Amino acid sequence: MAATVNLELDPIFLKALGFLHSKSKDSAEKLKALLDESLARGIDSSYRPSQKDVEPPKISSTKNISIKQEPKISSSLPSGNNNGKVLTTEKVKKEAEKRPADKMKSDITEGVDIPKKPRLEKPETQSSPITVQSSKDLPMADLSSFEETSADDFAMEMGLACVVCRQMMVASGNQLVECQECHNLYHRDCHKPQVTDKEANDPRLVWYCARCTRQMKRMAQKTQKPPQKPAPAVVSVTPAVKDPLVKKPETKLKQETTFLAFKRTEVKTSTVISGNSSSASISSSVTSGLTGWAAFAAKTSSAGPSTAKLSSTTQNNTGKPATSSANQKPVGLTGLATSSKGGIGSKIGSNNSTTPTVPLKPPPPLTLGKTGLSRSVSCDNVSKVGLPSPSSLVPGSSSQLSGNGNSGTPGPSGSTASKTTSESSSSPSASLKGPTSQESQLNAMKRLQMVKKKAAQKKLKK
């Protein structure tokens, strides 16, 4: 039996040697195929008893070992000419035996249930080893394919292989290209349509696979469709569009009214004052004027040029603005004190003026230290402040107060002061009430009016 095995194995061993020493990549696969062929052919006769013996109890395993040892001994016995070959073939044979023997043992231990049936049925004993051998051959192929598929699956799971061909091989013109949407890898040749060089090599371009581009187009179409669907309902939408148009002017009007408060409404009310000189109409127009800080700002801003307003009144009557302004500047607390002591100055002014009744109004406390506090009392009371104001400068103030209403002060200042009082007091005032915030605002507006008149006169002179 050993001799027959040797005769059959010699050419196969030679082939195996050639495959062992060859440097080609396919040599390992060919060696494997050769081993499978040799097992499928006549060598299986040497393995058949071993398989039969391995299936029964342990005693048969000793027989199996002895049978395996026989071919080794017989292969080492041939003549000296073949000694070198035999030694090398022995190594190959050992390696070839180790692999299938180990796999056979593992297969047989796993598939013990399968060979139990042939033991019971004697006629099938011959065919049973064949089935076992076929099962032995199959696991070899299955294992190799399992290893390959597991590697491929691993590569696929890691996203390293092409989705179409399931390979990681990369050629110069066939690189792996990644889709930016689904992050699948495609070979340039595997993808349909094929990926161009520009798409593959240009890092600025974002590449999408054909499937993702289709999906994105569908999504874009879906997003474009919704505005087209409610087209028949445009009729119902139009009134909603009209409503804001109707509402807009209302809101604008509201904004205008609110903004006018900050645009100083006294500008408009001053026109009312110029038209109607009666204090009743003025008080009604002032009610919509400024209050709080804005009113205070109006007072302070208009308080400064109040002396210039006096000079403007004198310009209307006489062409001497400089003297009156010079005399009116130093009016301070002394002028206020003289005006508040009694109605003497006011009475003197009233003798010269057309109005017999002049109300006595103390100034608001905020403008005490300013130069225009004589004006801030009211335009009607200029007579009482205008007359005692020269008393701070001129020594003949006692004669002015004790006089019978004529200008007792020497120089042009007294005459100008009397003129200012007569001009300013000509406007009748029906308000005999105490000073209120509205009246102070009235005074501020009158001052503004005077400033405007003066500016217009200056422009005309120029």
Swiss-Prot record:
A Gene Ontology cellular-component term: nucleus
Cellular location(s): Nucleus
Biased composition (Low complexity): 347-358, 382-437
Polar residues bias (residue ranges): 59-86, 301-328
Metal-binding as UniProt keyword: yes
Linked residues for Glycyl lysine isopeptide (Lys-Gly) (interchain with G-Cter in SUMO2): 68, 254
Subunit structure, interactors included: Component of the Integrator complex, composed of core subunits INTS1, INTS2, INTS3, INTS4, INTS5, INTS6, INTS7, INTS8, INTS9/RC74, INTS10, INTS11/CPSF3L, INTS12, INTS13, INTS14 and INTS15. The core complex associates with protein phosphatase 2A subunits PPP2CA and PPP2R1A, to form the Integrator-PP2A (INTAC) complex.
Protein's name in the database: Integrator complex subunit 12
Source taxonomy: Eukaryota, Metazoa, Chordata, Craniata, Vertebrata
